[in-house]
Amino acid sequence: MNHLDRIGVILAGGKSTRFGRPKAMVQYQERYFYEASLDALQHHTDQVLIISHPTLTNQFRRNEGIRVIEDDPRYQGCGPLAGIFTAIEKESAYWYLTAPCDTPFLKKEIYDILFSYLDQEPDKKAVIPVVNGRKQPLIGLYHRSCLAPIQSLLEQQRYKVGFLFQLVDTLFVEDKAFEQLHSSFVNINRPEDLSEWT
């Protein structure tokens, strides 16, 4: 699959209410949280898009070469599903690789694994890792054909990403390698969460 067929999407449209300040701009080991997602995605695509909360847009734009847009105004505040919708609607590609902005340990190998499974079942429309029995929908692959089903869910005010998997042919990936990469799926919601890993 050609890199031009892919766009990386960092989902940074949330309010970070529980953390108390914007999580994307928190630093861990001298880099911002979102930069871990950026690094992981840039191994798989030359194009990375940040879906930003309005209060962070200007800060993200200081990172030259990264396109930054805000959630579609119709769906601002409607969660990650709105961010995925905005990315697919605004930028043309076949596949959208999503990553949260608050996973400072995210590794590129996660996407290597997801693409290896997609290569075996290329007709799937979403590819989602499952770790310890839990789906991880914010670290996944979404085909451009997900646009209409996502918009339908948003219009119905059904904002959980999991609802999408009832509408599109989804491949759920359970792989033993995820056990060694389990920290990739750790999202930091509160300052004390980070202290557990430092």
From Swiss-Prot:
Organism: Halalkalibacterium halodurans (strain ATCC BAA-125 / DSM 18197 / FERM 7344 / JCM 9153 / C-125)
Cofactor(s), names only, from the UniProt record: Mg(2+)
Protein name according to UniProt: Probable molybdenum cofactor guanylyltransferase
Cited function: Transfers a GMP moiety from GTP to Mo-molybdopterin (Mo-MPT) cofactor (Moco or molybdenum cofactor) to form Mo-molybdopterin guanine dinucleotide (Mo-MGD) cofactor.
Annotated GO CC locations: cytoplasm
Family statement: Belongs to the MobA family.
One GO MF term attached to the UniProt entry: metal ion binding
Chief localization: cytoplasm
